[in-house]
UniProtKB/Swiss-Prot annotation:
This is Serine/threonine-protein kinase BSK3. A lipid is attached at G2 (N-myristoyl glycine). One of its GO terms (cellular component) is plasma membrane. It comes from Arabidopsis thaliana (Mouse-ear cress). Signal peptide: none annotated. The lineage of its organism: Eukaryota, Viridiplantae, Streptophyta, Embryophyta, Tracheophyta.
Amino acid sequence: MGGQCSSLSCCRNTSHKTAVLEAPDVDNGESSEITDVPNFREYTLEQLKAATSGFAVEYIVSEHGEKAPNVVYKGKLENQKKIAVKRFTRMAWPDSRQFLEEARSVGQLRSERMANLLGCCCEGDERLLVAEFMPNETLAKHLFHWETQPMKWTMRLRVVLYLAQALEYCTSKGRTLYHDLNAYRVLFDEECNPRLSTFGLMKNSRDGKSYSTNLAFTPPEYLRTGRITPESVIYSFGTLLLDLLSGKHIPPSHALDLIRDRNLQTLTDSCLDGQFSDSDGTELVRLASRCLQYEARERPNTKSLVTALTPLQKETEVLSHVLMGLPHSGSVSPLSPLGEACSRRDLTAMLEILEKLGYKDDEGVTNELSFHMWTDQMQESLNSKKKGDVAFRQKDFREAIECYTQFIDGGMISPTVCARRSLCYLMSDMPKEALDDAIQAQVISPVWHVASYLQSASLGILGMEKESQIALKEGSNLEAKMNGVPRVK
């Protein structure tokens, strides 16, 4: 693997060598169907609002934030399962029956190479899709905007193979069309394995657009007819091969000119110097050239892509998170005193820590009262909070619950009050009410670690150990992020 890119030559024939990839659940380069993903279901709008804190801006993960035409949010269901929620613009799918039929069809797919579609919501004008949440960003992020290290050649080859396997799986299930395949559609799961977003299997039915990217990257037949074909997907796959080879988003026409002129030094990412052999580089360039053929019928099919990419794989025994230089999802982060107390369900220690924290985490999220808003009712609510704080310190939990309830019922907002009442409920052997308050605290302050820790303690006492551990890790991640420490994925 010592050759550099400057000596690559552009060949004409594609090798069809066979090899067995040693990565988990891969046999002869084919993607396997999985059965441990929940069946597709319909969610209520209220469930998805609760999961995303009312579609809060802080929960947006789509490329262009809230300005994106169809915004994607991260969320967390009641059972602590993380989800991605795609919210289409109003009336993007005017025919609710068509939306449901299409979503149910895509929702039957289950592959380890995809961020599987878990469900949808179709209430009134709302059209939402729910998929598995992938916590480790997009290919675009790791390829074009990397922070610690550029993506290694070995990992780039794994990405294109897994992507080809995902497309081949879809093809085998009769889903041959994928809309606007690009580096933002490739996501990384908890183990840092690449997965294809299922959102791209459904397009916006009203505008009918299959490509939102620059026209320079659009398949030529789509420009002529406005229709997407299975061969159009292969063309887009070719543009992704160029992305991975160059580390940049190069227009296909320019890349093909460089290939024809054998100017591959300019085409290839300088970060890859010395990481691959001339023959491997030539093979990838040849495959990209075939995918980008002007005539659609001259492009390879998905099965040919898998066959060509499988023998190029290297270091198949090395896990993806190691190649990516990212922490493993099972890594254990040292817990803070509060996290440790919540993990042990040590309510006395939790009480001492919450009392010391005071209300400093309420800054910026509590009610800001103007002079004109100081009414007798407001003053009464604030007095109730003060009485609740006194009762909290004196461990009079029934009195504290009553006073904090008066404060909340008065329309006042405070995540700390919700957290304190949550702990009072735990002290009073009322874990369900405690969980509700902890969730409400997170609705008010979505990135507050204390709320996650209290959810963990409540879930544990309710006997939901798996969900408790998920919430505990989430709290640890949020606390580490707040303190500027690299978080555990």
